[in-house]
């Protein structure tokens, strides 16, 4: 049995199937970890969602920003963006079922010596703390008040983590770090405007702020997988 971690699929169903054939994926025994953003940009988001959902326990999916964008748009809290390509999902007969499945995926996944998140983790968070905070968001997304959460999810403030944060501010920081962040400073102040590969002055790539035993070195005890 093998476990494969796969970055942003983003609606590229044919390419995903080609990748699985390339490493002789055995759906009866192998497991797939998906590092968020199953949908959008590519032409076949609907096929991707159905395929991954039907894998059941053989697939682990963490949420990315495009996944949350689809959920928010389905529920009427976000307008379509010019580049959105998941209209096939919104128009599908099983749209409600698929979106309900998607919004109940975790924010993080930790197993053995590995952890997975879509974007990044703030320097103040251990992996255990990140999993705990991710569960707070998961409970809000899966609970009866999930529409209130979606209504308050968007925004770039607060910019940094504080243990005293509460309510929507607390959850928003967690969502932004785990699904949007590329860069932050050593105090955990996020730069959510930076879209390139190089951080602006005063910021670092998020993983450069973390202990070296948590960013994928061969000898580490804890490793973080993300889509970078």
Positions of the model-derived regions?
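Active-site neighborhood of divalent metal-dependent phosphoester bond hydrolases
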Residues: 46-48, 54-169
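Single, functionally critical "micro-switch" positions that shape active/binding sites
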Residues: 7, 36, 63-64, 117, ...
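A generic secondary-structure signal marking the coil-to-beta-strand transition
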Residues: 2, 98, 112-115, 174, ...
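N-terminal active-site segment of His-dependent metallophosphoesterases
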Residues: 1-55, 68
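Tryptophan-centered motif/residue detector
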Residues: 33, 101, 125, 205-206, ...
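His/acidic metal-ligating clusters that form di-metal
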Residues: 104-109, 138-219
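Single conserved hydrophobic/aromatic residue that forms the stacking wall/gate
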Residues: 218, 222-228
């Amino acid at each position: 049995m093998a476990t494969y971690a796969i970055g942003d699929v983003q609606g590229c169903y044919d390419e995903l199937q080609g990748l699985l054939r390339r490493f002789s994926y055995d759906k009866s025994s192998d497991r797939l970890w998906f590092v968020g953003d199953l949908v959008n940009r590519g032409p076949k988001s609907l096929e991707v969602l159905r395929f991954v959902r039907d894998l059941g326990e053989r697939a682990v999916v963490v949420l990315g920003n495009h996944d949350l964008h689809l959920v928010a748009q389905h529920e009427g809290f976000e307008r379509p963006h010019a580049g959105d390509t998941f209209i096939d999902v919104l128009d599908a007969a099983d749209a409600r079922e698929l979106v309900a499945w998607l919004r109940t995926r975790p924010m993080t996944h930790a197993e053995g010596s590995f952890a997975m998140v879509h974007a990044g983790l703030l320097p103040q968070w251990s992996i255990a703390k990140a999993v705990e905070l991710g569960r707070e968001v998961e409970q809000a997304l899966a609970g009866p008040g999930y529409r209130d959460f979606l209504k308050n999810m968007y925004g770039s403030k607060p910019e940094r983590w504080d243990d005293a944060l509460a309510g929507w501010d607390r959850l928003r920081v967690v969502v932004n770090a785990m699904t949007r962040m590329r860069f932050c400073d050593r105090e955990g102040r996020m730069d959510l405007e930076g879209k390139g590969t190089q951080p602006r002055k005063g910021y670092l790539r998020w993983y450069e702020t973390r202990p070296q035993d948590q960013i994928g070195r061969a000898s580490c005890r804890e490793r973080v997988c993300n889509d970078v």
